[in-house]
Design a protein with these regions (language model features):
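N-terminal topogenic module of multi-pass integral membrane proteins
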Residues: 1-110, 230-270
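Hydrophobic, aromatic-rich alpha-helical transmembrane segments
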Residues: 8-19, 61, 65-69, 118, ...
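Hydrophobic faces of alpha-helical transmembrane segments in multi-pass integral membrane proteins
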Residues: 21, 25, 70, 74, ...
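Transmembrane alpha-helical segments of integral membrane proteins
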Residues: 215-230
Length: 270
């Protein structure tokens, strides 16, 4: 009994230390971006926080990197959003960066540690949303080829994350198919870049493609569940999300869109 109590105390202490270190990372990233807008230092901090990925023999790096693509996507995406908030020209820059930092803290402490199947879907969806937001915002800074490649990696990582949690034997093939679909969205993002925002937030806008990418991910996951579980599409848990996401995409593309090159070239300001 005494051993169990000691072990429990150690586990609690370890959990508290893990939370404290994650919150320290959030504070350091926020400070670096708010004070000096040094995105490269913030990215280095994100990489250093993933030291365990590389703390093995080099031949295991590929597996570890693929297994952590979702976490890398969110981390790099948060840095991009902090940078976007800093250059938004809004009088609420501080609060925008605080909001992004609070989200990052929730990701590290609450969302990321979960291991259930539903949690893996939430994690993958978060990566798709944050990653596509960042890529849409900076697509014309990094170029068309880089945008497509990053979309490809983001799609593979998100799909792999869900499929591995579901113990699918063909996860690599299926993840590659989804990655190709997202690569196409990456190409579209470069040429069709529209943002929605509030006038008081300045250039800090929500890209249309972030919403569309998330909807595509939800549709793909629900259709995958239909095939795997041999369920009928008429079941509400399958049909409702698919129909809702399809309607959202159609409304955005047909009624709230206009095309043109550039960073949020046709901005919808509320």
């Amino acid at each position: 009994m005494e051993f169990l109590q000691t072990s429990r105390r150690r586990n609690i202490f370890g959990d508290l230390m893990h939370i404290a270190l994650n919150l320290a990372l959030v504070c350091m990233v926020f400070a670096v971006m708010y004070v000096g807008q040094r995105a490269e230092i913030a990215l280095i901090l994100i990489m250093l926080s993933k030291w365990r990925v590389f703390a093995v023999r080099w031949r295991y790096w590929r597996v570890n990197i693929l297994a952590n693509l979702v976490d890398f996507t969110v981390g790099f995406g948060v840095v991009a959003l902090l940078y976007l908030a800093a250059g938004s020209g809004s009088s609420h820059t501080l609060w925008l960066q605080v909001g992004v930092s609070i989200f990052f803290a929730l990701w590290l402490v609450v969302i990321k540690p979960r291991t259930r199947a539903l949690a893996s879907k939430v994690q993958a969806g978060t990566a798709l949303f944050i990653g596509s937001w960042a890529l849409a915002a900076f697509s014309h800074d990094i170029g068309q080829i880089a945008t497509v490649i990053f979309y490809l990696g983001m799609g593979y990582g998100a799909a792999r994350h869900v499929l591995v949690a579901a113990d699918d034997k063909h996860y690599s093939l299926l993840a590659s198919v989804f990655a190709l679909v997202l690569a196409e969205l990456g190409w579209v993002t470069y040429h069709w870049n529209i943002g929605y925002g509030l006038s008081l937030l300045g250039g800090f806008m929500l890209p249309q493609m972030a919403i569309i990418t998330l909807c595509v991910g939800v549709i793909a996951e629900r259709l995958y569940q239909t095939i795997i579980a041999k369920a009928s599409f008429s079941q509400p848990r399958i049909s409702v999300p698919v129909i809702a996401c399809t309607v959202v995409v159609l409304v955005l593309v047909l009624f709230v869109s206009s095309t043109g090159p550039g960073l949020y070239p046709n901005q919808t300001i509320i």
